[in-house]
Amino acid sequence: MLGYFIGKICKYRLSVCVQNLARAFPHLSYQEINIHRHNFYQNLARIIWENFHPRLVKLHLSESALETINRLQKQRSQTILLLGHYGNWEVITKIPQFTNMPTKALYKPLKNRFLNYLSYKKRTKHGMRLLPAQHALRILLREKQTPSITFFIADQFPGHDNGIAVEFLQQTTFMFSGAEKLARQLNTSVGYVSLQPLNKLEWELDIKPICDNAAATSEGLITKQFASMLEKSIQKDPSWWLWTHRRWK
């Protein structure tokens, strides 16, 4: 019902959603695009509902993700984990319950101070530390000797004059490059985080390695690998990506 209201009544960024889907899947018919559009708004409604009831949402880690977390704890190394706006990305704030290592995530403070306070409080409830995006580089460089896991949502549009151009969903796309630059500067390991819905209110998080020594990689490799992995997640089930974001401008 909420999905119908958002997509059909409010028509929230409907034209952006349809245009993005058509650009990403030019081989699909109009009917097939509409099916993905409908499923997207239904899933968006679920994510919105879950974010209003975060205590009811459960996070599970795949076997490989648990192995990765355990290995990182033993190595006591710095790690950067990249993810996109796919599924309910807010559930990563529950990751501290699976590790003793400090966990951090970048965020952009909201202009409304009261809403920012509520958002900050909800996201840090389980021990996740939030770093304001504009200060993240300075903070992480200062703490580079401290083993930690830092999450970056890395599929935002960075502007045509910034970022790295990659082939993504049938078109040249500029990807946020700040995470890669930081990873190479700190010589961290880098991984890709994927989220899959399980039962209602349950998500499974998986981690796939991108590299162990970022400083040894060529420029753009990490970003291109991330884009490729995210594209595979989207192709598997397009309805969980945030199609209402003005990704291609």
Positions of predicted regions on the chain:
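Generic structural "secondary-structure junction" signal
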Residues: 8, 54, 63, 91, ...
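Structural element of the ATP-grasp superfamily
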Residues: 21, 123, 182-183
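Juxtamembrane/interfacial segments around transmembrane helices
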Residues: 51, 87-93, 233-235
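Membrane-anchoring hydrophobic helices of lipid-metabolizing enzymes
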Residues: 1-83, 118, 127
